[in-house]
Amino acid sequence: MKEYGNEIELIEFIVKSLVDKEDEVKLNVIEGEKSTILELRVSQSDVGKIIGRRGRIARAIRTLLGACAAKTNRRVQLEILD
């Protein structure tokens, strides 16, 4: 999990900047052999702010995450859970 410290900090910073209920932001890391899944949980009222119109904000966050994770040659996926 140390390998993903920067990615986790980046996602938490971005998400907490967008939501109203910062204390309900939870990020769970599930590590696989070649990929890692980051499960993001936010308040039900803040899910729309994270996804954005037509998924634009979620896509932008995933793009930043992919660029940050490219250094480790592993795939990192972001799942937004309600």
Curated annotation (Swiss-Prot):
A probable RNA chaperone. Forms a complex with KhpB which binds to cellular RNA and controls its expression. Plays a role in peptidoglycan (PG) homeostasis and cell length regulation. GO terms for biological process: cell wall organization; peptidoglycan biosynthetic process; regulation of cell shape. This is RNA-binding protein KhpA. Its main location: cytoplasm. The keyword Metal-binding does not apply. GO terms for cellular component: cytoplasm. Residues 35-82 form the KH domain. It comes from Borreliella burgdorferi (strain ATCC 35210 / DSM 4680 / CIP 102532 / B31). Keywords: Cell shape, Cell wall biogenesis/degradation, Chaperone, Cytoplasm, RNA-binding. It is found in: Cytoplasm.
